[in-house]
Design a protein with these regions (language model features):
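All-alpha prenyltransferase/terpene-synthase fold signal
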Residues: 1-127
């Protein structure tokens, strides 16, 4: 399931992070840090999506919910349970933020703050 996610949402998030680093003329270490950040962020996003599909409402999420379980699809919630999926998403968010290293709010100002906030948003979103 982790590999499948990496080919979908994860690839889009990694591309966005790495292309931004390239356009910003970041060095190899910064590009690697952003790529690793995006890998963790993409997986946390997918887990949050699985959680929303499990416990969200159509009004809140804006799309049909419960369809993965109805289709018998393997999700992070079905594999880890709801609490386990939440714990894994939180751990990935923390890991993503840790991977930023020199991109932290104190070191890189607004850019670092935005990336840290983005990681938090991914696991607290309700749609």
């Amino acid at each position: 399931i982790t590999h499948l996610q990496a080919l979908k949402t994860g690839a889009l998030i990694r591309f966005s992070a790495e292309s931004g680093a390239i356009l910003g003329r970041a060095g190899a270490a910064e590009r690697a840090a952003l790529r690793d950040f995006a890998t963790d962020l993409g997986l946390a996003f997918q887990i949050a999506d699985d959680i929303l599909d499990h416990e969200g409402s159509v009004e809140e999420v804006g799309k049909a919910v419960g369809k993965d379980a109805a289709a018998g699809k393997a999700t992070f919630v079905s594999l880890l349970g709801l609490a386990g999926a939440r714990d894994r998403a939180r751990a990935l968010t923390g890991s993503a933020q840790d991977r930023l290293g020199g991109f932290g709010p104190a070191e890189s100002g607004q850019a670092g703050e935005i990336l840290h906030s983005l990681a938090e948003f991914v696991i607290t979103r309700r749609s």
